[in-house]
């Protein structure tokens, strides 16, 4: 039963208790006629009874009010109790229904990371590790280009690839787009272990592109 329905029932009970008819044996006592000679006014009429008036009407009214208040409090608490009474198995099933969506989202993010395009990657090295024949303790951040250029292929690249597979072209090898530097870092200056000054130009990538 909804809250408003219960309130309506309570109001009907309250109205019934307040409008309860007088018990049998009750009648109005008519006031005596006005005595003009003495100048007295009419005496207000009062209730009289052949039997004693029951004393339980105030108690009945209090019982109705207590019932209304208890019903309203019970209805206010009922939504919280229903939520608390939700079986643990139902809550676990709802959590399990939400978890596959999260796992699928993580899988898609992982696939995007694997299939990334041409990007710039950095690694910390010693100049000697470059394999250029320098003996030095100088260090640098070497940046290089890595990744696939399939997403950057144009219609021209696709046509060349198809013609090369069908052997419609000459024996010349057709080049494909590669992930290459399109800009380089500033020159690197350093001293080797023999105190000889060296300069490395275009040694590290700054920006990458498919060319």
From Swiss-Prot:
PROSITE patterns reported in the protein's UniProt record: TGF_BETA_2
The family database entries (InterPro entries) matched by this protein are listed as:
Cystine-knot_cytokine (IPR029034), GDNF (IPR016649), GDNF_fam (IPR043401), GDNF_TGF-b-like (IPR047020), TGF-b_C (IPR001839)
Where does the entry say this protein is expressed, by tissue? Expressed in both the central nervous system (CNS) and in non-CNS tissues, including the kidney, lung, bone, heart, liver, spleen, sciatic nerve and blood. Expressed in brain (at protein level). Localizes at the proximal ligature of the hypoglossal nerve.
Q: Name one GO biological process term.
A: regulation of dopamine uptake involved in synaptic transmission
Which residues are connected by disulfide bridges in this protein?
118-179, 145-208, 149-210
State what induces this protein.
By melatonin.
Keyword Nucleus tagged: no
Residues making up the propeptide: 20-75
- What does the UniProt entry say about where the protein is found? Secreted
Region annotation (Disordered) ranges: 76-113
Alphabetized CDD domains for the sequence: TGF_beta_GDNF
**Molecular function terms, GO-annotated:** glial cell-derived neurotrophic factor receptor binding; growth factor activity; protein homodimerization activity; receptor ligand activity; receptor tyrosine kinase binding
Glycan-carrying positions: 126, 162
Span of the secretion signal? 1-19
Name the GO cellular-component terms.
extracellular region; extracellular space; Golgi apparatus; receptor complex
Keyword annotations of the record: Cleavage on pair of basic residues, Disulfide bond, Glycoprotein, Growth factor, Secreted, Signal
Instruction: Indicate the quaternary assembly.
Output: Homodimer; disulfide-linked. Interacts with GFRA1 coreceptor and RET: forms a 2:2:2 ternary complex composed of GDNF ligand, GFRA1 and RET receptor. Interacts (via propeptide) with SORL1 (via N-terminal ectodomain); this interaction affects GDNF-regulated, but not constitutive secretion. Also interacts with SORL1 in complex with GFRA1; this interaction leads to GDNF endocytosis and lysosomal degradation.
Q: Which family does it belong to?
A: Belongs to the TGF-beta family. GDNF subfamily.
Q: What does this protein do?
A: Neurotrophic factor that enhances survival and morphological differentiation of dopaminergic neurons and increases their high-affinity dopamine uptake. Acts by binding to its coreceptor, GFRA1, leading to autophosphorylation and activation of the RET receptor. May also modulate local neuronal effects in distal regions of the motor neuron. Involved in the development of the neural crest.
- How is this protein named in the record? Glial cell line-derived neurotrophic factor
Q: Whose protein is this, by species?
A: Rattus norvegicus (Rat)
């Amino acid at each position: 039963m909804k809250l408003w329905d219960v309130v309506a029932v309570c109001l009907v009970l309250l109205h019934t208790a307040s409008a309860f008819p007088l018990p049998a044996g009750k009648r109005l006592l008519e006031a005596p006629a006005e005595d003009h000679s003495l100048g007295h006014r009419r005496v207000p009429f009062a209730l009289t009874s052949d039997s004693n008036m029951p004393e339980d009407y105030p108690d009945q009214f209090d019982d109705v009010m207590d019932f209304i208040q208890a019903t309203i409090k019970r209805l206010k608490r009922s939504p919280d109790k229903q939520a608390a009474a939700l079986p643990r198995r139902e809550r676990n099933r709802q959590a399990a229904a939400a978890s596959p969506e999260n796992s699928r989202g993580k899988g898609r993010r992982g696939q995007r990371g694997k299939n990334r395009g041409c990007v710039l990657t950095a690694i910390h090295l010693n100049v000697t590790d470059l394999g250029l024949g320098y003996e030095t303790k100088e260090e640098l951040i070497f940046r290089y280009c890595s990744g696939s250029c399939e997403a950057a292929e144009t219609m021209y690249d696709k046509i060349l690839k198809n013609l090369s597979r069908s052997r419609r072209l000459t024996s010349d090898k057709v080049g494909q787009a590669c992930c290459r530097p399109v800009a380089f870092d500033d020159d690197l200056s350093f001293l080797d272990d023999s105190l000889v000054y060296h300069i490395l130009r275009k040694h590290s990538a700054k920006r990458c592109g498919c060319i």
